[in-house]
From Swiss-Prot:
A family per Pfam: Transferrin
Modified residues (Phosphoserine): 388, 684
Species in which this protein is naturally found: Mus musculus (Mouse)
Glycosylation sites: 513
Binding locations of hydrogencarbonate 2: 474, 478, 480-481
Name of the protein described by the UniProt record: Serotransferrin
Organism ancestry: Eukaryota, Metazoa, Chordata, Craniata, Vertebrata
Transferrin-like domain ranges (all copies): 25-347, 360-682
Family: Belongs to the transferrin family.
Main location: secreted
Xref: SMART domains: TR_FER
Assembly and oligomerization: Monomer. Part of a complex composed of SLC40A1/ferroportin, TF/transferrin and HEPH/hephaestin that transfers iron from cells to transferrin.
Gene from which this protein is expressed: Tf
A GO molecular-function descriptor: enzyme binding
Annotated positions binding Fe(3+) 2: 410, 448, 537, 605
Keywords: Disulfide bond, Glycoprotein, Ion transport, Iron, Iron transport, Metal-binding, Methylation, Phosphoprotein, Repeat, Secreted, Signal, Transport
Amino acid sequence: MRLTVGALLACAALGLCLAVPDKTVKWCAVSEHENTKCISFRDHMKTVLPPDGPRLACVKKTSYPDCIKAISASEADAMTLDGGWVYDAGLTPNNLKPVAAEFYGSVEHPQTYYYAVAVVKKGTDFQLNQLEGKKSCHTGLGRSAGWVIPIGLLFCKLSEPRSPLEKAVSSFFSGSCVPCADPVAFPKLCQLCPGCGCSSTQPFFGYVGAFKCLKDGGGDVAFVKHTTIFEVLPEKADRDQYELLCLDNTRKPVDQYEDCYLARIPSHAVVARKNNGKEDLIWEILKVAQEHFGKGKSKDFQLFSSPLGKDLLFKDSAFGLLRVPPRMDYRLYLGHNYVTAIRNQQEGVCPEGSIDNSPVKWCALSHLERTKCDEWSIISEGKIECESAETTEDCIEKIVNGEADAMTLDGGHAYIAGQCGLVPVMAEYYESSNCAIPSQQGIFPKGYYAVAVVKASDTSITWNNLKGKKSCHTGVDRTAGWNIPMGMLYNRINHCKFDEFFSQGCAPGYEKNSTLCDLCIGPLKCAPNNKEEYNGYTGAFRCLVEKGDVAFVKHQTVLDNTEGKNPAEWAKNLKQEDFELLCPDGTRKPVKDFASCHLAQAPNHVVVSRKEKAARVKAVLTSQETLFGGSDCTGNFCLFKSTTKDLLFRDDTKCFVKLPEGTTPEKYLGAEYMQSVGNMRKCSTSRLLEACTFHKH
């Protein structure tokens, strides 16, 4: 018995010992100097963290790849990486993600990006398109400003074969310094810095090293960030001896970097594991560290200073750190163009050499949409391919990342897509089948009306006494069902607690344990897709018929689901006069009077895509509409007809309006709608919107 008790006590003690590492964040250092700073970081954090709080430990490796592998294997937990390494860290099997971003500028105006620039000596006479045969200085192999961006720009000028990339670059320049390159396999890449040393102890490594290579090492051009020359040469007279190469093959003074840069690059990021990554612990440590050891906070230890070298653990020019939104992975953090540049380089592909006759990958939201899309793909003879996602935001993200190319969105989601960099391509048109006139005139369709519908029998309900009623919505962040009515309510109640304003409701996409999901009935309750029976226009109207007091829909919804137009059991006996509209002035009107009794006019649903894919989407969709846009669907495939309701496109679409080239989301949605959605931003629960606007402080 005594032995058993002793064993239990030992196990308990061991359990306590094993529990401690759960609160320990192991920071990975890539050099002796970094490890020395990390140890100082660790020791100083002990003095400011609570006794029961997180702890910092240091793990020393010899390179960034080794640290990335260590974090992936849980031997370490965090480190700061340049964008090029963030890409590598995000790939399988590493599966790391950004959890915090360095920012520059100031606390009031934080910048989570910097400019990649090409610096040359004043008095030389070549431009960006004349770099072949010159001597180049780079921050490091695979790094953003020093390699990924400049080589991405020069990629199609490299002689074939372009793989391995290092060999092609060796042939392009007469000599280079590319730290971290293989000096045996690619000796010309190490001509200006013998050995190509891959740590901050090497004289030509990193931003300062690349500039030193230009200044003192025989280089003709240095690829660095815009602040490098200001850090190295604080005197304007010294800086005036250098210039920037611009994309339009001109030159500008180094202080005009905002008008003369190669690319805008996301700042360095702290990365952690995607799963079980200790994100909260990491941020708790970084938050406290900034408060006590940030810029100008302490003389004993400074987070953003490197007495033993340069840019140790963090960049010395960083002003602080911001937490990255939880939805943001490495692709959203870096951006599609950046990721594509890396991928093209690694695969040895030159995009300029191909004619865009590729299929358009359409994003489908549910099993029913996927079934219709697959049918479309077959009958289109492969011009359309299909990609699936669970939610509209998942689809938008896939388009942003290049996994899909297009989908149709209502105004609310088109706003989010626009904030993520997508553009409107073609608009649905509901008035007539002659889309030529608005297309030729370059005008946008008028739009539809957002209305509030109630049962005619509930005579006491008005727009002014909706508090405590049961509400039915098409979905969170959708135009008629959410943004417009909730925006109007917000202006009245001045808070975002809509689940306290209504007693119950169904708002697909809202928090599932909320009262605004109480009325939902789908197999995947409150999901923002067709797995929720009350999703969308028809779903919200059905919610009103079966459970609710008010439904927020489009003006055609009642007309499309009454007088026998919808044969479903719940709708087949409904009459138009069974329902009325709530007017904002507190009156009610018949549903046919929507033109004089509506909440607002909404932009028509619109097809969105990435900028570089927009022309192809427009061309394919135009040809597909010619073939399958008619109304004779007997035995034929029709774009604008569905087995249920509004699959891929709205069923009442007559044709597509081609939008003028260069149409931005702001132009299409209109200033009034942009403002109303912008006002709702403080109430937004969209994780994707949060991620896409992170770099737009």
